[in-house]
Swiss-Prot record:
<feature type="transmembrane region" description="Helical">
    <location>
        <begin position="1104"/>
        <end position="1124"/>
    </location>
</feature>
<keyword id="KW-0808">Transferase</keyword>
<feature type="compositionally biased region" description="Basic residues">
    <location>
        <begin position="47"/>
        <end position="60"/>
    </location>
</feature>
<comment type="function">
    <text>Polymerizes chitin, a structural polymer of the cell wall and septum, by transferring the sugar moiety of UDP-GlcNAc to the non-reducing end of the growing chitin polymer. Plays an important role in septal growth or maintenance. Mediates colony spore formation. ChsE and chsD seem to play a functionally redundant role in lateral cell wall chitin synthesis.</text>
</comment>
<keyword id="KW-0328">Glycosyltransferase</keyword>
<dbReference type="Pfam" id="PF03142">
    <property type="entry name" value="Chitin_synth_2"/>
</dbReference>
<keyword id="KW-1133">Transmembrane helix</keyword>
<feature type="region of interest" description="Disordered">
    <location>
        <begin position="1182"/>
        <end position="1203"/>
    </location>
</feature>
<feature type="transmembrane region" description="Helical">
    <location>
        <begin position="1046"/>
        <end position="1066"/>
    </location>
</feature>
<feature type="glycosylation site" description="N-linked (GlcNAc...) asparagine">
    <location>
        <position position="800"/>
    </location>
</feature>
<feature type="compositionally biased region" description="Basic and acidic residues">
    <location>
        <begin position="83"/>
        <end position="94"/>
    </location>
</feature>
<feature type="transmembrane region" description="Helical">
    <location>
        <begin position="487"/>
        <end position="507"/>
    </location>
</feature>
<protein>
    <recommendedName>
        <fullName>Chitin synthase D</fullName>
        <ecNumber>2.4.1.16</ecNumber>
    </recommendedName>
</protein>
<feature type="region of interest" description="Disordered">
    <location>
        <begin position="604"/>
        <end position="632"/>
    </location>
</feature>
<dbReference type="InterPro" id="IPR054295">
    <property type="entry name" value="CHS4-like_dom"/>
</dbReference>
<keyword id="KW-0472">Membrane</keyword>
<keyword id="KW-0812">Transmembrane</keyword>
Length: 1203
């Protein structure tokens, strides 16, 4: 991106490639709006600034930065350097590209380095929402600066209609032109390497054949080819692992020859020159003292079996020529060339070296020396049975005089067999024989040059008795690879185990709430959780009251306790710096959310309806309900208009039963309270499941003044076997609506879909949770919890079609995420989002920008009473935590064998995998059934907040509607929950995603194998593709092998080779049983991998029953590691939800591409401010209004008696 500009610097030139995005066409078209917005933003005050500065402060900070960096002159530029992340080029692959694009249209620019935001150049501040206000002169409807209550002018109806029609025509033309441009690009765009590979690997299946097999669409054929390409890669990885496991040693080491250890050669063999020969079936021709056909091993008077007969076939006249010469008067035959017939007397000796020199002559001179050509040829044709080897310990035997040369073992005592009357030998031979220091030593280095080398070679030819026990280079390499792999795998297994224990014992307690309404004894609480988790419909245990206001002693100090170097996140406490938790409410502690003194209601239980308002609302009047209107720290973008007037059902009206906000210092659980949204996404769930889910959320011990239930129904769906549709079921669980349910209208919004389905409509219902007449929760324990229901009803065009309004769970999440982004950035919003804004205001009395965290729960999940408190405590205690999850327990453990095999799998995935990842703050999968995300986080100076879940980069990528590749479909259609976790880590790799074991929920898992098969198909495929995304993120914790990126890579490879791994495991076990010797190392490794989780159970679970669940899991390993992955890989191109979610119309076939064209002119988008002005205009025309008080604001009435 372009570098931050100094005051007075000229605008970047068009030819500057680093400034291209600043001069985009979108920005040039809005140039005339920049100055206009700058004026208004400069005049509007801001209480708690999310990411906004005052002009004067920004200018001062910018000048300070220049001075600190030693740069002189307004026109100086920073030099580009690789050491500054904020100076890197920001293109669409940058993790904060969209955030930069959004924030450049605001008065400040963001920082990704931890510094406070830096101001951009003058004239850079503008807003996306200004496009809806492109009016000039006298006919302009609204003004963007000043008081919004000033008289308003309207355009004539004819002009407005004409302008609207013109806008629709322009939109249609632009869409058609864009579609044609995309089609042209598709035709000329070169295929990617991956597409080319898939086409090559599937050349044998042309398109016309695939069409015959039920793939008429190009997208289907493309997905099938990509599937085959992925399967081929999986097979290659599996083959590589198999080769490394079994084939590498055989390839580089080969089949080792048969080797016989010295002193263990049996009497069936004779040894010649260090090799053993099997002579048990041999016969000897007739010779002196040897009858014809006799066996030399047993038939002769002297038994030669097991002896060394090297002197029978001596190697002469080779390297020893001219070293060993004929003595004077010798009887050894020789020729004219000086060749000798033998060197030693031709006698055998014992293999253990115990024979004494024998210089006698039997029968005749040269008897048994085998000097004839026939004898030599017969010997050379013999095949040796194997080498005779010595270990290094054998060479150090004190009873023998052994040395080693070039791998050959030499018996120096055999030099005593020389007959001085027959031959002469070098004196070096005697020196070596008499030197005790050479015993058991390798003489190769000592005898390596010149004459000494000849001596060593000569000795190897005449006194070699065997070979040293050594491996080839290939065998050594294979052993190195084996042991390195063993150490590597063991290190991963052991480190994961140890770190999981460390997290359980020491780290996890830091994130938990100091106290909750549950029993403080951990054993008692664990037992309560286990009992509660055994039945899906069992309510949580009774809660105790811990609503004690936390106040610190505030003594005035004569000396200053802070300085300009003090952190805004710490407060002085007796000379020590104590960390101060930061929330939206705590930052406004000097001006409370609810004006007035602390009332006695805060001393009562916050979850008791009697302390705040009765179930019928009788204890609250209108004045009290408006107590939350005066939000001194609230952003002026919203607060000004809200305080102006209160038309029933619109933005200014607050429900009479709204729950008063406690003062910020009220900390019932030892940490500042943060406002939370509890998102429950529904599809086809039944009444009983939804009821228990909402009951569990409503009955959590977290104060109901700081939690709001938000239910989103994904279409007009009726579950299988249900009497009512899911929206009707949910609406029957809401009471005291702001607007009567039959009067609620549908509003448009931009859905996550393609074609005409991109336009969708939804209804917004706001009220309070209704426990029902037959509730199992006693009335005195029922809390009054704000509730909002969004029903995606669909457009009129799809009213008669199947599942109107259904766009998927991701679309439901995007409705909320996009809304929060637009609230935080003050962007244009749809009519649906405006109604959501008003609905939240009306039932809570606070602005939606006060919400900091979102709890995401599926409609079939039940939450333990203190789980929400523990999760929010972790968020408040550590601002770096951007996401977390709790433990999911199985409620139907004993329903069938299918549920039984899942119990331990759930346990180990949390307490080992997620616990290990939490140590580094990089949990790769936050399950969508029970997780929490941070909407925004404090950063930098006081009152500075940066978007996290509401970040444009997260929202933009998560709302991707063009899903045209196999990879994208597996990410966005099957595993959207896991992809959201991936997006968060990819966008904010330095922040944390953790596991909070104190937060617990329960759910029902599939009890039929086909349902489990369908569920795991989606999970495994999405896991593979999400790991492919995460393995490319290089900024995660750690470096090289000691990093989360490396752990993710290992996990990806491990997931891909699961079928091959279980096959190899069975092979090793069976091979160890059948063949000897037993392969010890693989068995030890297997025992450690499977046994350590059992130790983890004993240490962390404290219940023996989980050991039994582990044994059941081990018996089902073929299902987990072979059946499920193999089925999933073959179904890579199946994007339906299968048997997991069934409706009255049958199985869910997924969300296919929408037909037709998207007409954006049907969706009205304005800033909240503009919507509110429209409402006021309608109020003025209807003649309704409230008499303003002093200063133009309505008269404020203190609910606590103050004035």
């Amino acid at each position: 991106m372009s570098l931050p500009q100094r005051p007075g610097k000229a605008s970047p030139r068009r030819e500057d490639p680093y400034s291209s995005f600043r001069e985009s066409s979108r920005r040039r078209h809005r140039t005339h709006e920049s100055a206009h917005h700058n004026d208004s933003s400069a005049e509007s005050p801001s209480g708690h600034r999310h990411h906004r500065h005052h002009r004067s402060r920004s200018s001062r900070r910018r000048e300070d930065v220049d001075e600190e960096r030693g740069e002189v002159g307004a026109g100086s530029r920073h030099k580009k350097t690789l050491s500054k992340p904020e100076r890197s080029r920001v293109d669409q692959s940058h993790p904060h590209y969209h955030y930069r694009q959004k924030s450049q249209n605001m008065p400040t620019q963001p920082s990704t380095t931890g510094d406070e935001p830096l101001m951009g150049a003058e004239g850079e501040a503008e807003t996306n929402s200004s496009q809806s206000m492109d009016y000039k002169g006298k006919d302009r409807v609204y003004v963007t600066e000043g008081n919004i209550n000033q008289p308003l002018e309207r355009l004539p109806n004819r002009r407005r209609i004409k302008k609207r029609r013109s806008s629709r025509k322009i939109t249609r033309r632009a869409a058609a032109a864009e579609r044609k441009r995309q089609e042209a690009l598709e035709q000329v765009r070169a295929p990617s390497p991956w597409t080319t590979y898939c086409a090559i690997i599937t050349f044998w299946a042309p398109d016309f054949i695939l069409k015959c097999f039920g793939m008429p669409k190009k997208a289907q054929r493309s997905a099938w080819r990509e599937k085959i390409g992925l399967i081929s890669l999986i097979l290659l990885v599996g083959a590589f692992v198999g080769f490394l496991t079994f084939g590498f040693t055989a390839t580089v080491c080969g089949t080792p020859p048969t080797r016989l250890r010295i002193n263990e050669v049996s009497s069936n063999y004779m040894i010649f020159h260090g090799k053993a020969y099997d002579l048990s079936h041999s016969t000897h021709p007739a010779a002196a003292g040897i009858p014809a056909g006799s066996n030399v091993l047993w038939d002769l008077p002297h038994k030669y079996g097991g002896q060394d007969g090297s002197f029978f076939f001596q190697e002469v006249n080779g390297a020893c020529k001219n070293l060993i010469t004929l003595a004077d008067g010798s009887d050894v035959p020789t020729n004219s060339a000086g060749d000798l017939a033998w060197y030693f007397p031709c006698h055998a000796f014992n293999q253990d070296g115990s024979s004494k020199p024998n210089k006698t002559v039997d029968y005749y001179l040269g008897w048994a020396c085998h000097t004839s050509g026939t004898a030599r040829k017969t010997f050379y044709n013999l095949k040796s049975a194997g080498d005779v080897y010595f270990t290094w310990d054998d060479t150090k035997n004190t009873s023998r005089n052994l040395a080693v040369y070039d791998g050959d073992v030499l018996d120096l005592d055999l030099l005593e067999w020389f007959n001085a009357s027959q031959v002469n030998w070098p004196s070096k031979f005697d020196e070596l024989r008499e030197n005790s220091k050479v015993r058991g030593v390798d003489l190769t280095y000592y005898l390596q040059t010149g004459q000494e080398k000849r001596i060593g070679q000569c000795l190897s030819q005449i006194i070699k008795v065997g070979s040293i026990d050594t491996d080839t280079v290939g065998c050594i390499a294979s052993k190195v690879v084996l042991y390195v792999s063993l150490i590597f795998i063991l290190s991963i297994v052991v480190v994961k185990f140890i770190f999981a224990l460390l997290f359980q014992w020491f780290i996890s307690a830091r994130y938990a709430a100091p106290r909750t309404s549950m029993d403080s004894d951990s054993k008692t609480r664990n037992q309560q959780i286990e009992d509660w988790a055994n039945d899906i419909y069992r309510p949580g245990p009774r809660m105790t009251d811990h609503s004690v206001v936390e106040r610190g002693t505030k003594r005035a100090s004569f000396l200053p306790t802070t300085s300009r170097f003090s952190s805004p996140y710490t407060v002085s406490n007796g000379g020590k710096q104590k960390y101060q938790y930061v929330t939206m409410a705590s930052q406004n502690s000097t001006t409370r959310l609810v004006p007035g003194a602390i009332n006695s209601m805060y001393k009562q239980s916050h979850n008791s309806s009697g302390g705040s308002i009765g179930p019928d609302g009788s204890r609250h009047n209108v004045a009290a309900s408006r107590s939350s209107l005066a939000l001194p720290g609230q952003d002026s973008r919203y607060s000004t208009a809200m305080l102006e007037s209160e038309a029933p059902g619109m933005g200014g009206y607050v429900h009479e039963g709204v729950i008063p906000q406690p003062p910020p210092e009220w900390q019932p659980y030892g940490f500042p309270l943060a406002h939370s949204l509890c998102l429950v996404t529904c599809y086809s769930e039944g009444e009983e499941g939804i009821r228990t889910t909402l009951d569990s959320i409503a009955m959590t011990d977290y104060p109901n003044s700081h939690k709001t239930i938000l239910v989103i129904c994904d279409g007009m769906i009726k579950g299988k076997g249900e009497e009512f549709s899911t929206p009707d079921i949910v609406l029957r669980m809401m009471k005291d609506p702001i607007i009567p349910k039959d009067e609620v209208q549908s509003f448009s919004y931009v859905a996550v879909a393609t074609g005409s389905k991109r336009h969708n409509m939804a209804k917004v219902y706001a009220g309070f949770y209704d426990y029902g007449e037959d509730s199992i929760i006693p009335e005195e324990r029922q809390q009054r919890v704000p509730m909002m229901v969004i029903v995606k009803s669909g457009t009129p065009a799809e009213a008669n079609k199947s599942k109107p309004g259904n766009r998927g769970k991701r679309d439901s999440q995007i409705i909320l995420m996009s809304f929060l982004q637009k609230v935080m950035f003050d962007e244009r919003m749809t009519e649906l989002e405006y109604e959501m804004f008003n609905g939240l205001w009306q039932v809570t009395g606070i602005s939606p920008d006060f919400y900091e965290v979102i709890l995401m729960v599926d409609a079939d999940t039940k939450v333990f009473p203190d789980s929400l408190t523990h999760m929010i405590a972790a968020m408040v205690k550590d601002p770096e935590v951007m996401g977390l999850c709790g433990e999911t327990k199985i409620a139907n453990k004993k329903d069938s064998w299918v549920t039984m095999i899942q119990v331990f799998e759930y346990f180990i995935s949390h307490h080992q995998a997620k616990a290990f990842e939490s140590v580094f703050g990089g949990v790769t999968c936050l399950p969508g059934c029970f997780s929490m995300y941070r909407i925004k986080a404090p950063k930098g100076g006081q009152n500075y907040w940066v978007p996290i879940l509401a970040s444009p980069d997260v929202v933009e990528h998560y709302s991707e509607n063009v899903v045209d590749t196999l990879h994208k479909k597996n990410l966005l259609l099957l595993g959207e929950d896991r992809y959201l976790s991936t997006l968060m880590l990819r966008t904010f790799p330095k922040r944390k995603q953790i596991f909070v074991p104190q937060a617990v929920c329960k759910t029902q898992v599939p009890d039929k194998f086909m349902v489990l098969l369908s569920q795991r198909r989606r999970w495994i495929n999405s896991t593979v593709h999400n790991l492919m995304e995460l393995v490319l993120v290089r900024d995660l914790c750690g470096t090289f092998c000691f990093s989360m990126q490396f752990c993710i890579f290992i996990e990806l490879i491990g997931t891909l080779v699961l079928p091959a791994a279980i096959a190899f495991t069975f092979y090793v076990v069976i091979n160890s049983i059948v063949h000897k010797p037993v392969q010890v190392i693989p068995l030890v490794l297997l025992a450690l991998i499977l046994g350590l989780p059992g130790v983890l159970i004993v240490v962390t679970a404290h219940k023996f029953v989980y050991v039994l669940w582990m044994l059941i899991y081990l018996l089902s390993l073929p299902v987990w590691n072979f059946v499920l992955p193999t089925y999933s890989y073959w179904k890579f191109d199946d994007f339906s939800w299968g048997d997991t979610r069934q409706t009255s119309e049958g199985k869910d076939k997924g969300h296919e591409a929408g037909e037709g064209e998207f007409d954006s002119s049907k969706i009205t988008m304005k800033r909240w401010r503009d919507f509110e002005k429209d409402r006021r205009l309608r109020m003025q025309m209807s003649g309704w209004g409230q008499a303003p008080g002093p200063g133009g604001y309505p008269t404020y009435q203190d609910p606590y008696g103050g004035h």
